[in-house]
Amino acid sequence: MTPTRVGAQIVEPAVFRVLVEMETRKAQRMRYVVSLVSLGVDEGGTSPAALAQRVAPAIRATDAVAMQTGDSVTMLLVDAEDTNLPTIMERLTPGLEDISWSAGGACYPKTAATADELLNQAERMREQAKRQGGRRLSLPH
């Protein structure tokens, strides 16, 4: 009997991009939402691989995490409203206490109309959180 995997699957960036595109198409057809959170380390201290290992167990097995260039990861959160993102980040924060981080979120179709917009918006929001001092989640208004 295979043990049940706990937490999100960590995938390569190219696979992640395909997953985001597929989920936004499914979300449009099935009328649900898809959110992304871009989480970055502001002052070194951990690699994207280590960051992915920290966050993956704290999110659902139906979600995905990808290491990005630089010191960041992006989380695909299926059927998670943008209003749920602060609660999700609260769940992740205990595993991030020893590093300086910034996060940005976006939600399809609420704040972004395409997969590209979703990815870009999450990145922009992360940069905004970093400019505001870090250790926070920034969301579009």
Each PLM stretch: what is its role?
Residues 97-102, 121-141:
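Catalytic/regulatory signature loops of cyclic-dinucleotide turnover enzymes
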Residues 16-43:
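Active-site-proximal structural segments of metal-dependent nucleotidyl cyclase/transferase enzymes
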Residues 1-12, 25, 32:
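Amphipathic HAMP/coiled-coil signal-transducing linker helices
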Residues 1-5, 70-71, 139-140:
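Catalytic core of bacterial cyclic-dinucleotide metallophosphodiesterases
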Residues 42-44, 76-85, 100-125:
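Catalytic strand-loop-helix junctions within cyclic-nucleotide turnover domains
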Residues 16, 20, 37, 48, ...:
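Heptad-repeat coiled-coil signal-transmission/dimerization helices
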Residues 32-34, 63, 101, 135:
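PAS-family sensory domain
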Residues 22-29, 48-82, 94-99:
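Conserved helix-loop-beta segment at the catalytic/binding core of cyclic-nucleotide signaling proteins
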